[in-house]
């Protein structure tokens, strides 16, 4: 099942993505995130990847957003240091 979900993403990475300029606002890129999420969480990881793609637009800051170890559709936010 995982291979079936990952194959179209690999196709996109190899043949479609190089045609366009880089535009993903996150690290890892949305396609790399989706592959890692599928490998960790299966079908739920696919949903996590779709949610990530929907978050990737010009009005978001972006930045580091690694795949969490637990299923969530929200961004994996880091704790910000408190200002003293």
Curated annotation (Swiss-Prot):
Output the superkingdom of the source species: Bacteria
**Where found in the cell?**
Cell membrane
UniProt keyword list: Cell membrane, Membrane
Instruction: List, alphabetically, the GO terms of the cellular component aspect.
Output: plasma membrane
Xref: InterPro entries: Membr_insert_effic_factor_YidD
**Looking at the keywords, is Transmembrane present?**
no
Chief localisation class: membrane
Q: How does it sit in the membrane?
A: Peripheral membrane protein
Region annotation (Disordered) ranges: 63-84
Q: Does tRNA-binding count among this protein's keywords?
A: no
Pfam families, per this entry? YidD (PF01809)
The protein's job, in short, is:
Could be involved in insertion of integral membrane proteins into the membrane.
Q: Which protein family is it in?
A: Belongs to the UPF0161 family.
Q: Which NCBIfam families match?
A: membrane protein insertion efficiency factor YidD
Name of the molecule in the record: Putative membrane protein insertion efficiency factor
